[in-house]
C-alpha cells in the first residue's frame, strides 16, 4: 500500500474513534439544556482537567508553538508562562460560579454578569461579542484540519474535503452529546497529544543532535545564542523587550480564564473540590508544550529559512526519513489539537448564542422554556455556526485573522467585571457597561495604531487601565444595584 494512504488511513481511524468516544457519553445525561450545556454538573477531576487543558490548546500548539521556538527562540516560553498563571483566577471565581449555577440554574458567564449588573443588554452584547470572536477562532481550527489532511495526502484529499471530514465528526458528537461528548473526546485527545508531543520532542533532538543538551550547545556555537537569551526575539528578529514580554504574559494570563468557552466549564464541575483541584493541577498540562518547543528548536540549524515558521513541523515530517506509522500518528495528533479546541468552541458558541442572546428577547423566552425546545435550538445554532465557520474556512476570502489580533486583549476586558461581580458591591450596571466598552475600544485603538502607545506594552494592558478607571469612577456616581442582588454574589 502507498505510504500516503497508510498515513491517511491512520488519520481516518483516529477520526472514527473520536466519533464513537464523542457520541456514547451523550447517552448518559438528561435531555435538558443543563445536561447538554453543563453535563448535569457532573464532571469529575479527570474530565475537567482534560476538557480545560485540551480545549485551550488548539492547532496553534502543534503548529504555532514549534514556529515560535524556530523563529523567536526562548520567546516561545511566553506560551508556557501565561498558561501556568492563567488558571489562578478560576481558583477564586470558579467555585463561586459553580455554586451560583447549582442554586440559580446559570450555565454561561454572561448569565452571571447580566444578573449581577441587572442588564439584559449586557447579556446580548456579550453573546454578540462571543460569537464574533469564536467563529473566526473555529474557522482557524477548520483551516488547520484541512491543511493537515491535504498535506499528508499529497493533495489527493482537497483542502475543502479535509476540513469537512474532520469537522463533520466534531459536529456530530457535539450536536448529539453536548459538553459530555466534548469532555470525553478531549480526555482521549489530550492523552494522545501529550504522548505524541513527548515522543517527537525527545526523538527529533536525539536524532539530529544526539540529545537536548547538545542541541542547545550547537545553536550557541553557530552564533545564534541570542535566540536562547530571555526574553527572546520579536517577529522581525529584534530583541523583545522585557516590558513587551511581561505585559504579553500578563494580559494573556488575565484573558486566559475569561474565554467564554473556558469559563462556562466551571458550571460543569461536580463540586468545589474538583474545581479547585483542577486549577492546582492545571500547570502540569504545560508539560505538553515543553516538547513541542523542542521540535522548533531542533529545526533551527537542520532546516533553516523555512517561511512561514508555523509550517516547520510538517516540513520536518516531510523531509526526514521517519517511519510511516509515526508520521500518521503525528498527523492524527495535529488533528487532535485542532478538534479538541474546535469542539469546545462550537459547543460554547451555540449555547451562548441561545442562552445569552435569543433567550433575552421577550418574544422568544416563553417558547424556549417549553420542554426541550431550548436544547433543540442550541443544536440548530451549532449546526448554523459550523456551516458559517466552514464557509469562512474554505470559500470566503475574508481576512479573519485580523478579527483575532486583539482577541486576548479584548477578552481580558471581562476580568474587572467578573472580579467586581463577586468582590466589589459598589459596582453598578452603568459602570460595568461603560468600563467594558471603553476597555475594548482602547484595546482596538492601540492594536491598530501602535504608534500611539506611550510605552512598549501590550495594548490590552492600556485597555484594562481605562476599563478599571471607568468601572470605579462611573460606579461611584451612578445608582447602586439592589442590595439583595449584590449579596447573592458577594456571599456565594
PLM segments and residue spans:
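Membrane-embedded helix-loop-helix hairpins and adjacent transmembrane boundary segments
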Residues: 1-492
